[in-house]
């Protein structure tokens, strides 16, 4: 059992972190570290994409690469797709474009992996913060034990499921058409190109999926550490790990024949290093008696199935959001490829390739905004545990302002200020398509403003036991608003025969969903929050959550 001195040390640390009279500074103290944590965690994939695009294909940066345009053609000639005839000059279907296509069709699976990664850990973090706010040591220990076991088991089960459907998902992302026996050489090469992209993409995502348990446990340790008021060490690890990631990707891509797969191997190595850093830190805290994450007192007897259900209900909103966005990306890319074939004489993946950079940056900035919200979520959960509803209202206003400021900074830097330079130097956008790609980038990255205002409602409902509302707002952008808009934009694009209209879908969807979400959240906060918490008889779901957390 913890000694009285150990308990006092932990309580002092928590009070210093959470109970400052300057609430806005408390928000920043938690939001800034989680912003950088989320930014650099998302940058793993972002940096991988850049390094792969720059170093995998044969070029000045990698003159020894075996991934050349000629090698691609020779492989096509030796494949079952080639039925004879002269091979046309494919200016778009090059080794470089193959790499970009692989990254694009893999992106939705990477997004769903992120959804899986944060599902149970985030729910555990919210419950853990609430129990610390209440000061109930029994429930604190129950949350720690249940969260650790649940994260491990959930990781193993989901890895098996996603591995089983990964290849078919990649094929759907590319809208792979049925192979025909008598087609023109141009179509033959397109079929070969698509099949090659799916094969490489499968190897890439299999590695990331197979080891996804490592980043899941790292996330768990980060969320729980922050719930105890710790910021410095847990926030420093991701940036340092990201630097290692750049080094490993360079070595494996530049000096091996692994190609795109090399970046996945590098990511797993870095995930493992990050995980071990947190484990060593946790052991150090245990030895000094400065953490509730006790390894010595861990017991399977404290694992509660009912608490796991509570954790799942809370974390499900974040899973729904990331998962639905993965489905959104899949359908958007599939419809875009179909519209490209129908309305233009470009290759199937022409516009898909142009959007590689803009979509990657948009995903990065959205992840960073959700990092800000994670820091806020920790504070709100603690305040909720203490019953400080007035502070929760003030935090909501501060959160909206902070998220908009961060969104504006990200957009001005990454879209406006450095937009063209990023597209040219990091994503190898050609001079011929730079103006169009930059136009798309400005449009697509504008989503970050609406993500910033809409996501505050999800955070509010998650932390205040209103899980049904949190599920609704989390599905707003990826399903509820997106599905009708998808068909509306498709119809308008076909009617006007202007495919650039379809590019606006992502931002229009984010704008409408964000405005609806913030309206729902603000109405509940100002008109229903006080009445709801004053009620003695609450819904069964809320009673269940309050009983076990």
From Swiss-Prot:
List membrane-spanning regions. Answer: 27-47, 108-128, 146-166, 197-217, 233-253, 265-285, 308-328, 352-372, 399-419, 434-454, 472-492, 501-521
Does Mitochondrion show up as a keyword for this record?
A: no
A GO CC annotation recorded here is: plasma membrane
Matching entries from InterPro entries are given as: MATE_fam (IPR002528), MATE_MepA_subfamily (IPR051327)
Q: Which domain of life is it from?
A: Bacteria
One GO term in the molecular function aspect is: xenobiotic transmembrane transporter activity
Where found?
Answer: Cell membrane
Q: Which UniProt keywords apply?
A: Cell membrane, Membrane, Transmembrane, Transmembrane helix
Kindly give the membrane topology term recorded for this protein. Multi-pass membrane protein
Mind telling me what this protein is named? Answer: Uncharacterized protein MG447 homolog
- Organism of origin is Mycoplasma pneumoniae (strain ATCC 29342 / M129 / Subtype 1)
